[in-house]
Design a protein with these regions (language model features):
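Short loop-to-alpha-helix "cap/lid" segments that border enzyme active sites
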Residues: 1-124
Length: 124
């Protein structure tokens, strides 16, 4: 709760409340954000499917779903879209995988090699 309040105070000080999304894999953190700072956009970082990422994202009012790339299927992406989620995938470092996920229609990629992603995805 203390961390959430610190984030909220900093965001207010710098007039960033409407420009940030706090992401976490912790349901405790997402719960605290929901309770203490509902005006801050939230995102779920999902690494496993044993807790349905779409259900958890909905439960905590998330607007973003950051999926481990291995969890990103066309079906899951379509369901996330219907739920109104921005879908980001991580960590995507191989050009062929970047292209495949972009072709699926993900909203963003998280990579250790941004220049590689730009050159890969700018090619027709």
């Amino acid at each position: 709760a203390r961390t959430v309040m610190a984030i909220k105070e900093l965001a207010e000080q710098h007039r960033l409340l409407d420009r940030i999304t706090v992401t976490s894999s912790s349901r405790e953190v997402l719960r605290a954000l929901n309770r203490l700072a509902p005006e801050i956009s939230r995102g779920l970082v999902a690494e496993y499917t044993w807790l349905d990422p779409l259900k958890v994202a909905r439960q905590y009012g998330c607007s973003l779903l950051a999926l481990k790339w291995t969890l990103c299927t066309p079906e899951r992406l379509e369901k996330a879209r219907k739920q109104g989620l921005h879908v980001s995938v991580w960590t995507v470092n191989e050009p062929a995988l970047m292209r495949r996920l972009a072709d699926f229609g993900v909203d963003s990629l998280i990579t250790d090699y941004p220049s590689l992603a730009v050159s890969t995805l700018s090619r027709s």
